[in-house]
């Protein structure tokens, strides 16, 4: 039931002028589902995030103590006269959740914390050697296992008192000595308690007290002595016993849980035993990551058909027979073992390739000559290229070097835990027949089903009731926002922006907060129409809890479901920033000034092409694609067409294109890429000569990167300024107008315009440079003008303004025109690229690629290009795509937007569901052919609703 509006129940905004907003006044109803829409760059985010949310955050920070604020940075007051009725604000944006490889969907949602509690409290330990469930062990059972060790074995019985704890433990050592003990095992080394034991207080230590040293004799006296020692240990450690053997290995026993047949025992079941971020539970080899970075032969050997002299070994390809010490050492190996340099790598025998990669087992003569001419001869083992890469990757302190060596490495599943992340003890505990990691590998849908069907006894039900309820609730929230195809083991860094946002949305629903203002940025991104209504219902649940939802959105279904719709425009950039229309969706549709309203009412629409492209008759065929959930499928992609890859979320679209097609073609065309086991065969790669992936990844990560530098138009602009009369008189070259080199840039901020303040434990904070006032250049450089504008003034222009300004300069105006053509006319030339959305970054890349002359044999790959685009902007994008296809090129697009799908020349629909139930081709053909397959395809069902009958 929707809450009734009260006359004074509004967020009142007066005089909003942030960015391009033109003194906007608006009353936004509280406790409602409010959508802000408008063309890209019209000012939606400026109103929602930079004004309303920013003011909410500023007021929150103002309420904190000055001590707390120093760690959170300053929050400037947005350019607005007044905001009244503002509730506590929470922003749910599209930023990736975490880049930490330890963060998973389970940890960021905190569901894994509840799972650890559940497995620790009601899980049942099982012997990994197949001896059934493990029960608690008696002292005599443990003594029997120690007594059964080989006769005359020398063992030491230890009491583990400190496990992975920091400190110097001086008082503990004194206490042990007072109790009459003589020795301790500290971090694997035996000390007497008379020794001065100095420990680093910041390092984690393991300490065990030596209770007895025994030679195993098969007599009653030895057995009694073992029992007495175990009883002493039990009093010190609550049942944990260690036995140190002669060879240094330690046997672990526990009164808590142990197998009476093979002696396997585990420590007390605690939640931290199941944490892959805890030293207690994480695998000792991979430290809980589940993988390790190892050199990859396929990346080290660029092309096995080439010889070493021809550059087959990638790291040596530019220094073959040069003076590099690395090459000279390698040449010593080659000469010693007579490995031919002119023979293709694939023709070398296995032992020769092993020497190249793994090095020599014996010392060999290594000859080198330094740059100064000094000769050096040493006899030593040559470590091999693979070991060289691994060592330097670990040792380097340079991020650039680490990334360079990373290019020759791959993630390899941990050979000890086999990707399970946890130690054997934790994995031996089962609930419903599976371990905790196996549960996290189930899809959200299947994990809910598993928990609902879980059979527990009365005691387990009582203990686990609350944790089970919380887990099922949180999993259900994830399902309701369309993430049922994911699993809790999914690494957070691999989630898309839309998926990460919906996870945060589900987390907020679980918090059951009321009276909050939620500001969201396109939550429908990456969501199939099938799941869209579930997302809308979820947002309505949040509204019905008594919250205000302020959603920036372009999706028609979401706009029509809103209680209140705000249209900002009428256009983008300086031509936007006005309140065009507001009210119910019906009221906005009736407003003739609203472009959004015209699209919603059907008065304006993206037209269906009368004739679809017939293509050039050539194809690329992928056979046996089997990455992730792909079911060994064969896919045919027709060329010189707009090919749409569709399907529900998680159906395998990215697996097919981004993880199979793209790397396969890059391997063939550019001699780079991944191993061939992701598919069986690819046919027709010779039908293209180039593949261009236009992704939504950032185009730069520093304040110096901007659209002008990325598309190379800034070089031309700098040349123009350097050729002015005043610049020539002063002797300025084009480098004077670069903020990347000394000379013309500000010496205080080094051309950044901002000063970076390291926060150590928090993200770095950037503040405007007080010397240049954010203008990046020194005052002398800014004195040079072209048609009355300084270089900084030009960077402040929008793409459209700059196009008009430089219209008479063809090499500049042509590049700027392309930015306008892809719908970025509003974008500031000098904007920091870290502020760009994924969709904006994608379109900037597209405009750069369009600068190059087409060969007619290029394959473009776009991943959800509709992200951040209004229907009017989609129209512009489709015009560009049609231009590409007319040049003879091919465009492959992963997309959910029906307005793009309906103009496709060919559609490949994957499904039928997401996750394990996806990965198959359910329908394919032209849109007209697809809608005849509605019984098999969700996409076809929704597409049939918008295709006009007379177009079929």
UniProtKB/Swiss-Prot annotation:
Domain of life according to the entry: Bacteria
Transmembrane helix as UniProt keyword: no
Amino acids binding ATP: 38-45, 647-654
One GO term of the biological process aspect: SOS response
Keywords: ATP-binding, Cytoplasm, DNA damage, DNA excision, DNA repair, DNA-binding, Excision nuclease, Metal-binding, Nucleotide-binding, Repeat, SOS response, Zinc, Zinc-finger
GO CC terms: cytoplasm; excinuclease repair complex
GO MF terms, alphabetically ordered: ATP binding; ATP hydrolysis activity; DNA binding; excinuclease ABC activity; zinc ion binding
Record's subcellular location: Cytoplasm
Domain ABC transporter positions: 316-595, 615-944
Zinc finger residue extent: C4-type: 259-286, 746-772
NCBIfam families from the UniProt entry: PRK00349.1 (NF001503), uvra (TIGR00630)
Functional note: The UvrABC repair system catalyzes the recognition and processing of DNA lesions. UvrA is an ATPase and a DNA-binding protein. A damage recognition complex composed of 2 UvrA and 2 UvrB subunits scans DNA for abnormalities. When the presence of a lesion has been verified by UvrB, the UvrA molecules dissociate.
UniProt cross-references to HAMAP family, sorted A to Z: UvrA (MF_00205)
Quaternary structure (record): Forms a heterotetramer with UvrB during the search for lesions.
Family listed: Belongs to the ABC transporter superfamily. UvrA family.
PANTHER family: UVRABC SYSTEM PROTEIN A (PTHR43152:SF3)
Protein name as it appears in the record: UvrABC system protein A
Organism for this UniProt entry: Mycoplasma genitalium (strain ATCC 33530 / DSM 19775 / NCTC 10195 / G37)
Gene from which the chain derives: uvrA
